Every structure is written in C-alpha cells, then in structure tokens.
Amino acid sequence: MSNISVIGTGSYVPNNIITNDFLSTIVDTSDEWIRTRTGILERRISKGENTIYMATESAKEAIKNANIEANDLDLIIVATLTPDNFMPSTACSVQKEIGAINALCFDISAACSGFIYGLEIACSMLKNSFRNKALIIGAENLSKIVDWEDRNTCVLFGDGAGAAILSKTKEEGILEFHSGSNGLKGEHLTCGVLKANNTPNKNDRLEKNNFIKMNGKEIFRFAVGAMNETICNIQEKTKWNLNEVKYIISHQANSRIIEYTAKKLNTEKDKFYMNLDKYGNTSAASIPIALDEMNKRGLLNKKDKIILVGFGGGLTFGGVAIVWSI
C-alpha cells in the first residue's frame, strides 16, 4: 500500500491588522492584559475577503508549492465553521475557482480540530481508492461570528486560511493519527444556536445567536489534557521520543495552553512552533497557516519528524505524526 505525504502548503491572511491597542478602544481591555493572558499581539481581520476567497488563495499557493496542476487533484476537503453559504459547499466553490474539475469536494465542521480531521479523512480516502492527490484547507472568517463587545472572546480570534496537498508516495510521510470527540462538554464552546420555534408553518424571521461563547476555564483544562493525551498517544504509536521530534505544531489558541502542555510533557516550550502573536486564533486555519509559514521560512527539512495537534469546539481533538517530505 502506498504511503501518503505532504507535498505542498499554502496560506492566506488578510492585510488588515487589528492590534491590541485598537481593541482597547472598543472594549475594556489593554495590550498588557491581552498579551499576558494569551500571547496575542495582533490579529488579521478580513475587509471584504470572504471564506471562499481566502480558501481559494491558500489553495493556489499550495498547488504552486506542490508543483502540480489543479486538475491533478482528486479530492478537496475544506474545514470551516464560517462558510459563506450552506450550498454550494466551500470546497465546491474552491473547485470552481481553481479549475479542479476531477476532484470530489465536501466541507467538514470540527472547529479548531477541523484541519486534523480533514487530514485523517483524506488519508483514509487516498489509501482505499483510486484517488492520488488531495487538497485539505482550513479556512475561517471568525470576525463575523465574534461578539465585539465581549472582551473575553473578541481579543482571541482572527481570519485566514491555510492549505496542504497530500499525495500517494513511496516515501515515509503521514504515519499515525489520534483523534476523538467529547460532546458531553460541547456546551463550553458554542456558536449559532438555532431557535426551536422556527418552523415552515410560521413566517417568523430566522433568529439565531451568531456569536462565539466560551467557558475559558473549562476549555483551558480540556485543551491541556487533550494535547497531552494526543501527543503521548502518538509517541506510543510511533515509538518516537520527543527528543527526535523537531517541532510540535499545535492549534494556535493561547500561549499559556502551550506552556502548560510543554511542562506536562517535560519538554521545552520552544519545541512548540507559535505564531499566534501575529494571527490570534484562526480555528481550523491555524495549523495549516503555521505549517505553511514554517515551510516558507525553511524551518523544516526532509525527514524531519513533526507532530500536528489540535483541539476545539465540539469538543474535538486530534493529532498526527508526519515525516516531512518537501
């Protein structure tokens, strides 16, 4: 059976930068308060760029980086909480924009774990079918579902998209996954609760709560536990020692979560790649944006061992061990 490797990456973030100082003019906060509690200095907020546009731009970069054509793609999966439409899917819209006429396309919704889930689904589909190449995108326009009057959440999130292309290869590449869900704790991170009285028999306008709501303490506790469990499980499956792992690329939610996880694993914080100071929490886009940034900066060499790990609403979590092949 063929191996599956990452052969290209891409990303897109809006040019519009919103600083902590700016946020302090609209909610009761400060640069110092945000920095010390989250590690975030600024975030990118879309100015007209929708989810499809950002996803498409990241896809174009990944295709170029992989040195393939769009019609070489057999599968497109987009992980997003913030689609522009329910139909057509964001993946189908990206297919149209890039001309990937041979691709099967669909979206998934797994919050900040979405990119990891997308990788696992794509690997399974490539291994068990005639398909050879897949495009996985994490794309979010979170600014449209953030409550800009809630200082506990509006300081956290940003917009952007990241993408990776997978291909069947003879080289060692994507090795082991560990993923799961805990719906019992889903109430701690929510968005978009539809009203039960919206029925075909009523002419009421659809009402819904569009804003992200989060129980920060519970999510922090869950995140540290899920990250630790996932990384340890992947180590057990791969027989990797953390000293062999060049980088852990985690969901970019909060620097404190990463620091606590590093302590639990008895490893240095610098093993975790972080760029949340520039982009904030971009949900499903955060891991592929970080991966592409590392690729562009030349931080990853062929045969490097890396672990990707995510956690988020649902509640969801997941991780994957990868031997870098670019």
Swiss-Prot record:
Segments of this protein annotated with the region ACP-binding = 252-256
Q: Where on the tree of life does the source sit, at the highest rank?
A: Bacteria
UniProt keyword Cytoplasm present: yes
Pathway where it operates: Lipid metabolism; fatty acid biosynthesis
Q: Which organism is it from?
A: Clostridium botulinum (strain Kyoto / Type A2)
Q: Name one GO molecular function term.
A: 3-oxoacyl-[acyl-carrier-protein] synthase activity
Q: What does this protein do?
A: Catalyzes the condensation reaction of fatty acid synthesis by the addition to an acyl acceptor of two carbons from malonyl-ACP. Catalyzes the first condensation reaction which initiates fatty acid synthesis and may therefore play a role in governing the total rate of fatty acid production. Possesses both acetoacetyl-ACP synthase and acetyl transacylase activities. Its substrate specificity determines the biosynthesis of branched-chain and/or straight-chain of fatty acids.
SUPFAM superfamilies reported for this sequence = Thiolase-like
Name the record gives this protein: Beta-ketoacyl-[acyl-carrier-protein] synthase III
| Chemical reaction(s) catalysed | malonyl-[ACP] + acetyl-CoA + H(+) = 3-oxobutanoyl-[ACP] + CO2 + CoA
Per its UniProt record, what InterPro entries does this chain match?
Answer: ACP_syn_III_C (IPR013747), ACP_syn_III_N (IPR013751), FabH (IPR004655), Thiolase-like (IPR016039)
Q: Cellular component terms, GO, for this chain's entry?
A: cytoplasm
Q: State the encoding gene.
A: fabH
Cystine bridges = none
